[in-house]
């Protein structure tokens, strides 16, 4: 098998790419990707486009997604529509979906990748900080899924992939807010898979582990996060890459997974089973007076 080239830490397209799947796996499909202007969402958009898909990438920052769209189109030759949208505001979601449908005439795939996170012990977590994460992660996922269902998926079918996390699987310290929000999304995945399956809609979650070159790793692991996690105490002792996550999402969104619905696909090298909780870091946080 051809060796995959190293990933790119920054939000840039890969300098070279060797297809592991058929290049036309998503030929002429249209994917709506929240959080598509950076990190994992950006790489998902790139990998989808390298497999024949057109994309709509959305973020609150129009300059960010506009710049990302230019890079994606230049690297892949596929169409990419950048839109500004706040997943927490249903009217904004409706307007963005309407604009995407006007541009492409359809949406085949929804990737819910928008998220918010930070480190904080539960004892210092403000009511507003907790609500903000739930609003983005949980309510945002519902808002976009519900709007797309009403405007297209109910009558035409579709695929939804929710990007979640492994935090709730082992009670990760300093992550109550994100763990609870993402666990709710995993529950939503199962409920929607059951309720919307008869309309030919598949719904799955993908839970990444520690992934290099992402804002999440930088924010949660600090400025030296990549070197800090170089030798993880996990079955596959290294950080994952954005490309590896994107390939897994590609599988779930493609006809290869045509009979897969309602699952949480964990892509973390097995680290959720072996990576220890950092109780010492929890104590450091709790000894400070800072509250979020």
Curated annotation (Swiss-Prot):
Domain of life: Eukaryota
CDD domains the record matches: TER_DECR_SDR_a
Modified-residue entries (Phosphoserine), positions: 287
Source organism (scientific name): Rattus norvegicus
Subunit structure: Monomer, dimer and oligomer.
Gene3D superfamilies from the UniProt entry: NAD(P)-binding Rossmann-like Domain
Enzyme kind, highest EC tier: oxidoreductase
TM segment ranges: none
Descriptive protein name: Peroxisomal 2,4-dienoyl-CoA reductase [(3E)-enoyl-CoA-producing]
Binding, NADP(+): 35-40, 60-64, 86, 182, 208-214
Gene Ontology CC: one annotated term: peroxisome
């Amino acid at each position: 098998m051809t060796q995959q080239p190293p990933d790119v830490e920054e939000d840039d397209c890969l300098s070279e790419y060797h297809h592991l799947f058929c290049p036309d796996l998503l030929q002429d499909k249209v994917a709506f990707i929240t959080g598509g202007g950076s990190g994992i969402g950006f790489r998902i958009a790139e990998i989808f486009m390298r497999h024949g898909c057109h994309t709509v990438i959305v973020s609150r920052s129009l300059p960010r997604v506009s710049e990302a769209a230019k890079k994606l189109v230049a690297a892949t030759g596929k169409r990419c529509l950048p839109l500004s949208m706040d997943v927490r505001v249903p009217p904004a979601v409706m307007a963005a979906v309407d604009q995407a449908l006007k541009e492409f005439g359809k949406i085949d795939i929804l990737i819910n990748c928008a998220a918010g996170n930070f480190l904080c012990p539960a004892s210092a977590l403000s009511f507003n900080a907790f609500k903000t994460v739930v609003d983005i992660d949980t309510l945002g996922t519902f808002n976009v899924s519900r709007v797309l269902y009403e405007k297209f998926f109910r009558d035409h079918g579709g695929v939804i992939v929710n990007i979640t996390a492994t935090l709730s699987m082992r009670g990760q310290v300093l992550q109550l807010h994100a763990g609870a929000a993402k666990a709710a999304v995993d529950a939503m995945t199962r409920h929607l898979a059951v309720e919307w399956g008869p309309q030919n809609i598949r719904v799955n979650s993908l839970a990444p582990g520690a992934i290099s070159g992402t804002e999440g790793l930088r924010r949660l692991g600090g400025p030296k996060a990549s070197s800090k996690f170089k030798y993880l105490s996990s079955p596959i002792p290294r950080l994952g890459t954005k490309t590896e996550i994107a390939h897994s999402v590609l599988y779930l969104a493609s006809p290869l997974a045509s009979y897969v619905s309602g699952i949480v696909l964990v892509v973390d090298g097995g680290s959720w089973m072996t990576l220890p909780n950092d109780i010492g870091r929890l104590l450091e946080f709790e000894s400070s007076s800072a509250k979020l």
